[in-house]
């Protein structure tokens, strides 16, 4: 290691100690090696002052001699230049100045070289020396960085203060420009409004996505004599008392009869037909007449028409209608029921092949699995009450039936001229579910809607045109007197016959029937009123037929029932329908009130509403139904309608019902 000599006067001339993030000590170093006797300990270095002074004196003398020699050389060079340049006085002053600058630079470089001869390179670090005095150098570096950071912070603070002053002055200028206004609401921009999108329920409220509907006016009627029907058909219609065709019959017959006549010459497929018409509008007659007219001249018996209905009563009703219309032909019309075993019924179908089969979907699927029925010659497929059949799976009947038809009616050279299956879909509340309708595999579908297109609310939920609807509002506190209110209202309105009352369950129908019978027995002493009920507990075919027969012949004046008979029950004598319990949907409401006002006859529907909750729900249901007349509100004064004596009799009737339950 070298000894070190520090000159305080030279510190001002030396370069900076901190350069580009590195600490570069600027130290003058001696060229003499430190002897062993100079070292006192690890951290202290002893300098030989006498020898240093002698060497310094020698160096100064040498420097002075060199300077004198340089001055003499410069003087000689100047004299020679003056002699040589005496003839060329035209040189410019700029050249002389440049030469003098060059000479000055050479002089400075020589002086710097002399200074460097006395010292070691300033940027070279002595690692051994700096390692011993590391703590001192670290403190020095820390102090240098702090000073630099302080300068940066102070400069940034000054800039922020200047910016704040400028922004403050600008705000003051803006405040001076703002106009003063009165104490009034400030004008606000118009709020953006969201675009109202059509909901999925609105989209599925109709069948416009399937085909363009064709509307048939309710008042559009036409005599059967104007249709091109066979003579036997005119006679059968006259014997049944049908003179004029209703709107749905006019629309269907006008389309299908010309197509049936055209298919006798060419096997053109005219497409399937979907019909939406209110209950009691004559849908059964609308599809029975074209089928019988098409099959009247058949030679070999084959299953050419299948009619699917949801319940057994509808099976009997449809078969009875078709048998009456087919009088004078050889058509074999059969119905499939659960009265006999499936094997015995299968043997009968194989022995005596029918022309028309009327069945429920579940029973038909069982026979298809046993190959009791062949669909190779099937010409017509009718789905009555289609919304109920499609909403209930019934052993996945639609997929099985359609797949069987495609399997047995293969399009090839042998049957290229044969007619394909034509589907007729009928319902009072036709479903709009695309997934359910797609299972029937429609071909060129056509939609007929019996309603006035200008007065539609929901084209698929409509009530009979001759129906009058009423709503009876009561407080929720009076719900405990509900059976008594119904009995007294029927007595006051003189509606003690041909009345159908709907309840929500089997238990409530039995309880209400018993309670009404007890009330009428105590109040109506002069006139005998018979009350009956119909639900799943007495749904056997024989018992059900007897009840309906008694109700039609007025042996039963008031019939209490559930929604079991709300579909397809064709009793034209019903004049009034009472919704004792409100419905769960507008679809069921349409089928309930459709039990009256059938075949263009007048009818009434009364709805008992207790409390604001039921009133709100009834409005929701009613808003989805298309009707010709508005629902009328009926105000009932309970103080005048029900006396104290009536309440006592009602309590006695409740006690008698309780005694029957205990027994």
UniProtKB/Swiss-Prot annotation:
Localization per Swiss-Prot or TrEMBL: Nucleus, Nucleolus
Matches recorded under InterPro entries: DEAD/DEAH_box_helicase_dom (IPR011545), DEAD_box_RNA_helicase (IPR050079), Helicase_ATP-bd (IPR014001), Helicase_C-like (IPR001650), P-loop_NTPase (IPR027417), RNA-helicase_DEAD-box_CS (IPR000629), RNA_helicase_DEAD_Q_motif (IPR014014)
Motif (Q motif): 222-250
Keyword set, alphabetical order: ATP-binding, Helicase, Hydrolase, Nucleotide-binding, Nucleus, Ribosome biogenesis, RNA-binding, rRNA processing
Region entry Disordered, spans: 1-119, 153-200
Record-annotated Helicase C-terminal domain positions: 485-642
Biased composition (Basic and acidic residues): 102-111, 168-177
Catalytic activity: ATP + H2O = ADP + phosphate + H(+)
Residues the entry annotates as binding ATP: 277-284
EC number(s) on file: 3.6.4.13
GO MF, one annotated term: RNA binding
Subunit structure: Associated with pre-ribosomal particles.
Function: ATP-binding RNA helicase involved in the biogenesis of 60S ribosomal subunits and is required for the normal formation of 25S and 5.8S rRNAs.
Protein family (similarity comment): Belongs to the DEAD box helicase family. DDX51/DBP6 subfamily.
Protein name: ATP-dependent RNA helicase DBP6
Source species: Lodderomyces elongisporus (strain ATCC 11503 / CBS 2605 / JCM 1781 / NBRC 1676 / NRRL YB-4239)
